[in-house]
A protein has these predicted regions:
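Structural beta-alpha unit
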Residues: 1-2, 25-31, 81-85, 100-135, ...
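Glycine-rich, Arg-bearing micro-motifs that act as flexible, cationic patches
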Residues: 1-12, 134-155, 173, 281-303
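Acidic, proline/serine/threonine- and glycine-rich low-complexity intrinsically disordered segments
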Residues: 6-25
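Short beta-strand elements of ligand-binding domains
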Residues: 21-23, 136-139, 163-169, 310-312
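Small/aliphatic-rich secondary-structure junction motif
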Residues: 27-81, 175-228, 247-254, 303
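Short secondary-structure boundary segments
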Residues: 65-67, 139, 208, 285-287, ...
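A short acidic, glycine-rich active-site loop
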Residues: 81-93, 226-240
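Short, structured interface segments
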Residues: 151-169
Length: 312
């Protein structure tokens, strides 16, 4: 195996011609993933970077740092030019640290972007400006009624049409869970995880949640025989979904360590499974291209301690 090398060019990053053509093409595909890493300089945000670096096959990472001054009370006045300079200096320090952290990994530093203003709007503007495959963020994971209330990561994920990788804690990046329901969105999540992440030597788990049919209908409208038939069809469908995921993974010689079919409320069962199996990364699709408000993905993001990769 040759040493991975690349050089900066005006059109992006291109691997050096130091390997055979097949490997060069593979490396170029590997390096072509374009990621936007959003950081406020917090440990939480760098946990996301460190975890992601353990999963990725390689990516060009742009870093955006927004110094958000909008939290200041209206009665507090600042000298515009001086405050802007202070913002820029703080952002430069954070971006410099981010570049050094990226260079310690297999990731490639793209460009540093500094903004002074409202964090969510600034990040959304940058996402609209460039074509990114994944947006990478940390989440502070507030508790109780504060959970995701006013969260930058929540607002960004809820308003973008690209995939996102959200992290709260640094972890071993070893166990990955595909939470799937067999829909096109879930199938896309499996394909993109294989495409963007290095799953070799990882422990792969697959979970399908069947909703309890007795909760889907008014009490007294179903007899026990009909309920049993519905449950039997659910099991057959779940078996098919797992076989399809297994078949897709086997194309890349990726074995499943454990699969499970459980019954209950999808978000709750996914959260429970991730906790019980000490999952490091949950991969999910979402039925809605942008908004995830009220979705299973949103609920899992709120509660789980694992990283979450939401594919759109």
């Amino acid at each position: 195996m040759c040493q991975r090398k690349c050089r900066q060019q005006s059109g992006g990053v291109e691997p050096e011609q130091s390997c055979d053509t097949g490997l060069v093409n593979y490396l170029y595909e590997e390096f072509s993933m374009h990621v936007l890493f959003c950081t406020d300089g917090s440990k939480i945000s760098f946990n996301a970077l460190h975890n992601f670096a353990k999963w990725t096959k390689g990516a060009v990472v742009d870093v955006i740092c927004v110094i958000d001054w909008t939290f200041l009370p209206d009665e507090v006045s600042v000298e515009t030019e001086g405050f802007a300079n202070s913002c820029a200096n703080v952002a430069d320090t954070i971006l410099s640290f981010a570049q050094k952290e990226i260079e310690k990994t297999s990731l490639i530093f793209g460009q540093g972007i500094k903004r002074c203003g409202e964090a969510v709007d600034s990040i959304l503007e940058q996402i609209d400006r460039e074509k990114y495959d994944i947006v990478l963020m940390g989440s502070h994971g507030k508790k109780g009624i504060q959970r995701w209330l006013g969260s930058v990561s929540r607002d960004v994920v809820n308003n973008i049409s690209v995939s996102s990788y959200i992290s709260k804690y640094e972890n071993k990046a070893r166990k990955i869970l595909f939470a799937t329901d067999g829909t096109d969105n879930s199938n896309l999540a499996v394909r993109d995880a294989i495409k963007y992440l290095n799953l070799n030597e990882k422990e792969i788990y697959v979970c399908v949640v069947n909703e309890n049919p007795s909760l889907l209908f008014l009490e007294g409208t179903l007899d026990s025989h009909w309920l049993l038939e519905i449950e039997e069809q659910q099991l057959k469908n779940a078996d098919r979904i797992i076989r399809d995921v297994r078949s897709k993974l086997e194309e890349y010689s990726l074995p499943i360590k454990k699969d499970a079919i459980v019954m209950g409320i999808p978000a709750e069962k996914i959260i429970d499974f991730a906790r019980d199996e000490q999952i490091d990364l949950v991969v999910m699709g979402t039925r809605q291209k942008s908004k995830i408000r009220g979705s299973v993905s949103k609920r899992v993001l709120e509660i789980t301690a694992a990283d979450v990769f939401i594919v759109k």
